[in-house]
Design a protein with these regions (language model features):
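Conserved histidines in hydrophobic membrane contexts and catalytic metal-binding motifs
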Residues: 29
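Catalytic core of pol beta-like nucleotidyltransferases
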Residues: 1-26, 35-40, 51-96
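Short hydrophobic/aromatic beta-strand micro-patches
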Residues: 47-49
Length: 96
């Protein structure tokens, strides 16, 4: 199983290329990997904030992140998170 540090390092290395391909403002880990509670069955929860329209490229980005990390990714748009849920995940965020 990959560690949180390995995932963070992989995302940091790929971030410039991802930002060139997609209108990404920021990326952050949250959930079990961010809390250090991940198991073999855990997916990688990633919150992404965009600085432009993403449309169908959202799905392409999710697939690219899964390939990059070799793990199932749950990609969540910051604009798609309701305020009450954001309060819950905000404390877990690890920005890359």
């Amino acid at each position: 199983m990959r560690s949180t540090q390995e995932i963070k390092a992989t995302l940091q290395s790929a971030k410039p290329l991802l930002m060139a391909r997609y209108p990404i403002e920021s990326l952050a880990l949250f959930g079990s990997f961010a809390r250090g509670e991940a198991t073999e069955q855990s997916d990688v929860d990633i919150l992404v904030e965009f600085n432009g329209s993403i449309g169908w490229q959202f799905l392409t980005l999710a697939d690219e992140l899964e390939t990059l990390l070799g793990l199932k990714v749950d990609l969540v748009s910051r604009k798609g998170v309701k305020p009450r849920y954001f309060e819950y995940i905000q404390k877990d965020l690890i920005y890359v």
